[in-house]
Amino acid sequence: MKKNISRRSLIKSFGGLSLPLMLGSKSSWGHDNKVDDTRDSNYGKDLDALIVVDVQNDFCPGGSLPVAKGNKIIPIINKLQKKFNYVFYTQDWHPKDHSSFSTNNPGQKAFNTIDMYYGKQVIWPPHCIFNTKGAEFHKGLDTTYAKTIIRKGYRKEIDSYSGFFENDRKTPTGLKGIL
């Protein structure tokens, strides 16, 4: 028996990296994290959307803030996005003087937590600095399907982990309005 999941509730995680956020039917995912074309293709229709989150060089092996095996999801994304009419990408896009970087917080080490005006903030190694190789999408990712790219984290005083709002949970990125 196939169980449909609310579009808003399905997040498919891979190796600790929340990539991609799939707004569709879970029934098309096999148990091995591979798309199974023999199953119900209940996704990719009408207003379903695929949101590809931060598949950038700095988050892949060899980058400044790598996720182990983060690049392994790229073939899955490339296959999935062909089935959606609406594909959106998010892209971490920081200035070099971003407030979350360890280099801009004397006495703080990467992965420490500090208090910011909007709440707790993890201190990160510099990553995804705009117009650098690290901020670019991974070369294996076929970005031709992206209808829109939402850049986030470009305000130096606030970080952004969400494709929808900055970390203050008030400042929108624009994605909600597009959807």
Q: Predicted regions span which residues?
A:
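Non-transmembrane, interaction-prone segments in cytosolic or luminal domains
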Residues: 1, 83-85, 169, 178
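Short N-terminal micro-motifs specific to bacterial/archaeal maturation
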Residues: 1-2, 64
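N-terminal export signals
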Residues: 2-4, 9-30
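Short coil/turn linker and secondary-structure boundary residues
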Residues: 5, 132, 170-173
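Secondary-structure junction/capping motif
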Residues: 6, 138, 174-177
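Active-site acidic carboxylates
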Residues: 31-165
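Alpha-helical scaffold elements lining the catalytic groove of polysaccharide deacetylases
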Residues: 157-179
